Design a protein with these regions (language model features):
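RNA-contacting regions in translation and RNA-metabolism proteins
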Residues: 1-46, 56-81
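Glycine-centered tight-turn and secondary-structure capping sites
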Residues: 48-52
Length: 81
């Protein structure tokens, strides 16, 4: 598990009411790394935040952490199943 993925998972679990439903996957696509964050449908609004500010902050943190590892990170927040 990469450091970026761990950071995203820890932050998401801290922000949600259902931390056990948080799931994070990481995949490589050419020169980019895609991190998908799956959360409970009831928590999706908390992670997006007002006007998308929380989601934007999470994406910025993931991108910055990825730069330290030499990775181009894209973070997508999705409703889990």
């Amino acid at each position: 598990m990469s450091g970026v993925r761990e950071v995203v998972e820890v932050l998401a679990k801290a922000l949600t009411d259902r931390p056990n439903d948080v799931r994070v996957t990481e995949s490589q696509h050419k020169h980019k790394t895609l991190i998908e964050l799956f959360v409970s449908p009831s928590d999706i609004g908390k992670l997006i935040g007002r006007q998308g500010r929380t989601a934007a902050a999470l994406r910025t943190l993931a991108a910055t952490a990825g730069e330290r590892e030499g990775k181009d990170i894209t973070l997508e927040i999705r409703e889990g199943r």
